[in-house]
């Protein structure tokens, strides 16, 4: 029995026969940030990190995508899922949060930003493919990390990971994370976790983008290919 290929949500099914059946899958797939994203809270701020690969099916559409999206001066989000969906949600939240800040005449809270993401992702949960991590700093609570996975749930965590590559590093982050880590330790922790995920996950790759957010502001850096941590694979000696 001939198998019927079903394309991603929002696109037409791929034909089972004819000239179009042999067309590359990226012609029928939506752009996805397949991805590995991460955020860690430290005393005085947060660190965010993400890979930079965007895929359309098996085709790498962009090698240097910026998945760390600014929502306000000291609030960022990490995006995973459909690139179109996550960009649209991030733009809408940025717009709403900007007006909220103007009305209050003060910087918005990180919790407020996360709640806006949660509300939108839950309301349109049947239509969106978006997993988002919100992290930032505000004067009331300091550094905070919130996770809004697909479906619209919101939970605050000391650290959060997401995306297709996250399944490869749950053991590493659980074993390595500890309370009281410094900013530098969190940056190294995030870089190591992302590098491990990028080695195993075909939808994660490119460069590593990092951001440290604290009261003074945002510090961003990019780890290029020769700067990404390398992990050797043990091999048995020849017999």
Curated annotation (Swiss-Prot):
Residues 2-34 form a propeptide. The modification N-acetylalanine is found at residue 2. Transmembrane segments: none annotated. GO terms for cellular component: cytosol; nucleus; proteasome core complex; proteasome core complex, beta-subunit complex. GO terms for biological process: proteasome-mediated ubiquitin-dependent protein catabolic process. It comes from the Eukaryota. It catalyses: Cleavage of peptide bonds with very broad specificity. Keywords: Acetylation, Cytoplasm, Hydrolase, Nucleus, Phosphoprotein, Protease, Proteasome, Threonine protease, Zymogen. The active site is at 35 (nucleophile). SUPFAM superfamilies: N-terminal nucleophile aminohydrolases (Ntn hydrolases). Gene3D superfamilies: Glutamine Phosphoribosylpyrophosphate, subunit 1, domain 1. The keyword ATP-binding does not apply. The modification Phosphothreonine is found at residue 69. InterPro entries: Ntn_hydrolases_N, Pept_T1A_subB, Proteasome_bsu_CS, Proteasome_sua/b, Proteasome_suB-type. CDD domains: proteasome_beta_type_6 (cd03762). It is found in: Cytoplasm; Nucleus. Its EC number is 3.4.25.1. GO terms for molecular function: endopeptidase activity; threonine-type endopeptidase activity. The 26S proteasome consists of a 20S proteasome core and two 19S regulatory subunits. The 20S proteasome core is a barrel-shaped complex made of 28 subunits that are arranged in four stacked rings. The two outer rings are each formed by seven alpha subunits, and the two inner rings are formed by seven beta subunits. The proteolytic activity is exerted by three beta-subunits PSMB5, PSMB6 and PSMB7. Component of the 20S core proteasome complex involved in the proteolytic degradation of most intracellular proteins. This complex plays numerous essential roles within the cell by associating with different regulatory particles. Associated with two 19S regulatory particles, forms the 26S proteasome and thus participates in the ATP-dependent degradation of ubiquitinated proteins. Belongs to the peptidase T1B family. This is Proteasome subunit beta type-6. It comes from Bos taurus (Bovine).
